[in-house]
Amino acid sequence: MKKLLLLLCIALLCPGCGGKKDNNENVVLPSESPIINEEIKPEETSTPEPSIEPSILPKEDTSTLSNKKIGWYFMKGKDHNQPTFGKDLSVPADKYDAIYLKSNEDKTIYLTFDEGYENGYTAQILDTLKEKNVKAVFFVTGPYLEKEKELVKRMVDEGHEVGNHTINHKSMPTLSDEEVEKEVLDLDKKFHDEYGKSMKYLRPPMGEFSERTLSITKSLGYTNVFWSFAY
């Protein structure tokens, strides 16, 4: 009994022992970090606004990198074979972990759609994808995100990936390092504020890029996604 009373006294004298973690939601763009909750007392706490970090990977010194503008293109393969890509692409996209072609061993097709503006087809595309139970990636711009909220909400609700096509759809090699980051992260923040999700795939506007812009966007945690077929 004396031991029990002694333990109770120690517990009362040390109410802060063990500490308490705040219920924080730390968001590192473009990928979301899990929320870790550890409650000690049943009290209400306010959740701080998620923070936006401009970079999640060490930056490369871009002053040593080429900023020659490269326009992405492909050449159709014969007999339904996979396409080939321009020999003058002086910077191989895969050097910076960009995606443009996957192995055809499993005969998988990845569908991506650029949503720079709405021409009346997206609702039909979403209907067809839903009917066939197929998921796709839709790359949206800032104006599209603002004007086509119903369609973007459908993309999110129906399980599609919404990718970053930058906020103003500018040729990235013409921008400074800071402007490139702003074009990408401003759109990411708007999307996160509206839907609670972060973007992780980027399609450079007009398919124009340079070694410098690939490096910058990779440092932001993005995967650049090009294409091997267009319609």
Regions found by a protein language model. Give the residues of each.
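Sec-dependent N-terminal signal peptides of Gram-positive bacterial secreted proteins and lipoproteins
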Residues: 1-22
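N-terminal pre-catalytic segment of deacetylase/amide-hydrolase enzymes
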Residues: 17-111, 118-124, 131
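Generic structural signal for well-ordered alpha-helices
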Residues: 96-97, 126, 149-153, 184-188, ...
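Short, well-ordered coil/turn segments that N-cap beta-strands
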Residues: 106-109, 132-136, 158-160, 197-200, ...
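Conserved, mostly hydrophobic/aromatic
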Residues: 114, 129, 162-165, 202, ...
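Acidic (Asp/Glu)-rich catalytic clusters
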Residues: 125-133, 145-165, 217-219
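Catalytic domains of cell-wall/extracellular-matrix polysaccharide-remodeling enzymes
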Residues: 170-231
